[in-house]
């Protein structure tokens, strides 16, 4: 039986009541949005990018350029391309022999053209300014994908030392960082979006990664994270992983072909010298040791072993089934082994494997800050440090890198800060992420 509604008695409509205006609460909500809400990055990121652009212009105009390595880069490039010397053991500059792979040579040959050696350093500074801003834009894209709160994003722009490394020093580390940020961004985009282009992305990502290695070997600190992430992105298909990894070797051969044809042994010995000794007086991280201990091979082996243990522990805590899945991939290299949610584990593995490498690095010179500074907003966020403590940690960390010359006090503080951050990451993040893995029916 239907109820008949009388037209004389229509349902009453609720009157719209405007909420009371509370300017103080609105202000609090606005501040909370641009400080803690990831959506606030739509406001914060463009503003910070604009401020960075203006700041870099000011730094270039107001602070004199400091020559450290750029002149040596130019001398080495001229010895190669003007004198025709391709023997890596004979190519030298004002600061010593050429110790970087052929990608470095290629990039600084281009820079030599634009700056005409040392004649137009200001042109080189402008190029490095653009390099900084492009790298920052990629960082922001990565942060946005990872839903970092704006207060963490701001940390990426607060380093006095980092600005100096780029536009006042012109170090080659900046180009390695550019390629590594691009590589991590590619893998992060893939991990955040289900796509059938896994093979394409992992192959192109491997090419970018190899480009970074061909500029400077510090990119190898990402290698453990790269191997596991590539395996996961390719869903355990070993053949796809091998194809992607082969691209690394392909680029190394292509970019160094001129040297490999002429003096292959000398090139490999000079460009990839893992036994190279670093100068103790410029090492920021181990000043609380004496120089003999710093140069001791036992100390170097201990650092390498500690790095290996930390990386393996981190990986197996996050992905305890890795050995079993890897064994299955070996037995069936063309078969899909795992399908997993990669949104957290891929960027986390990449950034923390690099950070562990930095913590146990034999030496950290001032320019090496660029190796990992861009990952600090993510690491601090993942460590679950509250905002006040996060800023305190960052300020203390920045103090260490701006303390000149390297000294015992800053060195102890730097090691303590980085070790404590790694411990917080272990406490808050080191739990199985890939546990409910869907397996393809055989």
Swiss-Prot record:
<feature type="topological domain" description="Lumenal">
    <location>
        <begin position="224"/>
        <end position="236"/>
    </location>
</feature>
<feature type="topological domain" description="Lumenal">
    <location>
        <begin position="319"/>
        <end position="336"/>
    </location>
</feature>
<keyword id="KW-1133">Transmembrane helix</keyword>
<dbReference type="GO" id="GO:0052925">
    <property type="term" value="F:dol-P-Man:Man(5)GlcNAc(2)-PP-Dol alpha-1,3-mannosyltransferase activity"/>
</dbReference>
<feature type="topological domain" description="Lumenal">
    <location>
        <begin position="1"/>
        <end position="42"/>
    </location>
</feature>
<feature type="transmembrane region" description="Helical">
    <location>
        <begin position="410"/>
        <end position="430"/>
    </location>
</feature>
<feature type="topological domain" description="Cytoplasmic">
    <location>
        <begin position="186"/>
        <end position="200"/>
    </location>
</feature>
<dbReference type="GO" id="GO:0006488">
    <property type="term" value="P:dolichol-linked oligosaccharide biosynthetic process"/>
</dbReference>
<feature type="topological domain" description="Cytoplasmic">
    <location>
        <begin position="258"/>
        <end position="297"/>
    </location>
</feature>
<comment type="function">
    <text>Dol-P-Man:Man(5)GlcNAc(2)-PP-Dol alpha-1,3-mannosyltransferase that operates in the biosynthetic pathway of dolichol-linked oligosaccharides, the glycan precursors employed in protein asparagine (N)-glycosylation. The assembly of dolichol-linked oligosaccharides begins on the cytosolic side of the endoplasmic reticulum membrane and finishes in its lumen. The sequential addition of sugars to dolichol pyrophosphate produces dolichol-linked oligosaccharides containing fourteen sugars, including two GlcNAcs, nine mannoses and three glucoses.</text>
</comment>
<comment type="pathway">
    <text>Protein modification; protein glycosylation.</text>
</comment>
<feature type="topological domain" description="Lumenal">
    <location>
        <begin position="397"/>
        <end position="409"/>
    </location>
</feature>
<feature type="transmembrane region" description="Helical">
    <location>
        <begin position="88"/>
        <end position="108"/>
    </location>
</feature>
<protein>
    <recommendedName>
        <fullName>Dol-P-Man:Man(5)GlcNAc(2)-PP-Dol alpha-1,3-mannosyltransferase</fullName>
        <ecNumber>2.4.1.258</ecNumber>
    </recommendedName>
</protein>
<keyword id="KW-0256">Endoplasmic reticulum</keyword>
<keyword id="KW-0328">Glycosyltransferase</keyword>
<feature type="topological domain" description="Cytoplasmic">
    <location>
        <begin position="431"/>
        <end position="442"/>
    </location>
</feature>
<feature type="transmembrane region" description="Helical">
    <location>
        <begin position="237"/>
        <end position="257"/>
    </location>
</feature>
<feature type="transmembrane region" description="Helical">
    <location>
        <begin position="43"/>
        <end position="63"/>
    </location>
</feature>
<feature type="topological domain" description="Lumenal">
    <location>
        <begin position="109"/>
        <end position="164"/>
    </location>
</feature>
<keyword id="KW-0812">Transmembrane</keyword>
<keyword id="KW-0472">Membrane</keyword>
<dbReference type="GO" id="GO:0005789">
    <property type="term" value="C:endoplasmic reticulum membrane"/>
</dbReference>
<dbReference type="InterPro" id="IPR007873">
    <property type="entry name" value="Glycosyltransferase_ALG3"/>
</dbReference>
<dbReference type="Pfam" id="PF05208">
    <property type="entry name" value="ALG3"/>
</dbReference>
<comment type="similarity">
    <text>Belongs to the glycosyltransferase ALG3 family.</text>
</comment>
<feature type="transmembrane region" description="Helical">
    <location>
        <begin position="337"/>
        <end position="357"/>
    </location>
</feature>
<feature type="transmembrane region" description="Helical">
    <location>
        <begin position="165"/>
        <end position="185"/>
    </location>
</feature>
<keyword id="KW-0808">Transferase</keyword>
<feature type="topological domain" description="Cytoplasmic">
    <location>
        <begin position="358"/>
        <end position="375"/>
    </location>
</feature>
<feature type="transmembrane region" description="Helical">
    <location>
        <begin position="376"/>
        <end position="396"/>
    </location>
</feature>
<feature type="topological domain" description="Cytoplasmic">
    <location>
        <begin position="64"/>
        <end position="87"/>
    </location>
</feature>
<feature type="transmembrane region" description="Helical">
    <location>
        <begin position="298"/>
        <end position="318"/>
    </location>
</feature>
<feature type="transmembrane region" description="Helical">
    <location>
        <begin position="201"/>
        <end position="223"/>
    </location>
</feature>
């Amino acid at each position: 039986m239907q109820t008949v509604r009388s037209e004389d008695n229509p349902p009453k409509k609720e009157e719209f009541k405007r909420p009371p205006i509370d300017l103080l609460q609105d202000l609090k909500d606005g501040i909370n949005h641009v400080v803690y809400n990831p959506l606030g990055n739509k406001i914060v990121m463009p503003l910070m990018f604009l401020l960075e652009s203006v700041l870099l212009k000011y730094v270039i105009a107001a602070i004199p350029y400091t020559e450290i390595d750029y002149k040596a880069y130019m001398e080495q490039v001229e010895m190669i391309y003007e004198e025709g010397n391709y023997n890596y053991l004979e190519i030298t500059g004002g600061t010593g022999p050429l110790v970087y792979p052929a990608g470095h040579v290629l990039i600084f040959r281009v820079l030599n053209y634009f700056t005409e050696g040392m004649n137009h350093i200001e042109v080189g500074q402008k190029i490095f300014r653009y390099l900084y801003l492009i790298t920052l834009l990629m960082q922001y894209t990565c942060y946005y994908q990872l839903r970092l709160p704006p207060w963490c994003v701001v940390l990426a722009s607060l380093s006095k030392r980092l600005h100096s490394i780029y536009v006042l020093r012109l170090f080659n580390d900046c180009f390695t960082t550019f390629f590594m940020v691009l590589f991590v961004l590619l893998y992060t985009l893939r991990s955040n979006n289900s796509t059938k282009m896994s093979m394409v992305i992992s192959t192109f990502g491997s090419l970018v990664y190899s480009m970074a290695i061909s500029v400077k070997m510090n990119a190898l600190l990402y290698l453990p994270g790269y191997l596991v992430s590539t395996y996961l992105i390719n869903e355990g298909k070993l053949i796809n992983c091998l194809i992607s990894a082969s691209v690394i070797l392909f680029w190394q051969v292509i970019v160094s072909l001129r040297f490999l044809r002429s003096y292959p042994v000398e090139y490999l010995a000079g460009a990839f010298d893992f036994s190279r000794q670093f100068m103790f007086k410029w090492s920021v991280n181990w000043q609380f040791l004496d120089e003999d201990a710093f140069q001791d091979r036992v100390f170097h082996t201990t650092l390498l072993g500690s790095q290996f243990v930390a990386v393996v522990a981190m990986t197996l805590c996050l992905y305890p089934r890795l050995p079993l899945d890897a064994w299955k991939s070996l037995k069936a290299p063309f078969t899909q082994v795992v399908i997993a949610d990669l949104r957290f584990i891929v960027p986390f593995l990449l950034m923390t494997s690099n950070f562990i490498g930095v913590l146990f690095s034999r030496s950290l010179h001032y320019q090496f800050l660029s190796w990992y500074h861009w990952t600090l907003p993510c690491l601090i966020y993942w460590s679950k440090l509250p905002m006040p403590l996060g800023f305190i940690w960052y300020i203390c960390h920045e103090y260490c890198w701006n303390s000149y010359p390297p000294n015992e006090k800053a060195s102890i503080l730097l090691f303590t800060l980085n070790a404590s951050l790694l411990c917080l990451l272990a406490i808050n993040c080191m739990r199985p992420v890939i546990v409910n893995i869907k397996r393809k029916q055989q």
